[in-house]
Amino acid sequence: MTPAQHERIQALCTEFRLPTIGAEVVKRFQADQQGPALETLLAVFELEASDRRQRRVDRLRRASKLPAGKTWESLDRSRFPAKLQQQLEELATGRFVDQTTNVLAFGLPGTGKTHAMAALADRLIEKRRSVLFVPTFKLVQDLLAAKRDLDLPRALRKLDHFEVLILDDLGYLKQRADEAEVLFTLIAERYERRSIIVTSNRVFSQWEEIFQSPMATAAAIDRIVHHSVITEFDVPSYRTA
């Protein structure tokens, strides 16, 4: 057994939270001249590690509430401009999550922005990132209900468990003042701490209709855009193609 294999066994034991086994198993097997048995043990450990990772991915995918079928493989990226394709490829690395960067996807209905962001999320889940996909209007109603029950802080903490929160179709429905308030609270809570992905048919100049006042609109845009990647889906609608 090679030194690299020894290190791999120790690394896997650390991953399994079995540090004592990691420290002792190689020494004891070698002392008993059980090299082939160590190789078998490594193979079993690798199988266990692979199975654990897949189970975690499956759990993350179930928790994400992503729309079915919107995967990276099913996304026809060739219909997008070269710049957008490059942006999506970079976002798929997941580095933006480490940097708590936000992503904004603008485009008319049918241009593929929701599919693209859901597909991006699916790729992130494969990298064992936690993601939640939710229509903005539904999340706003859930937060309003929590606020009425004096439970808004707990609801926000629950959302904080997700590294990436996808707000789909921001501005699809006009917000009332109380709805705009909880939406702004959510954005402010995640600012520079967790990433938000926003899809919207509305450009920034129309966001005052969402947040109800120039001051709240400017503050919301500032927090979302401060660390962000802006993607523009300037392509024909696939629904009319």
Outline where the language-model segments fall:
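Intrinsically disordered, low-complexity and often Lys/Arg-enriched segments
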Residues: 1-11, 241
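N-terminal pre-Walker A segment at the start of P-loop NTPase domains
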Residues: 70-92
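Walker A/P-loop nucleotide-binding motif
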Residues: 100-116
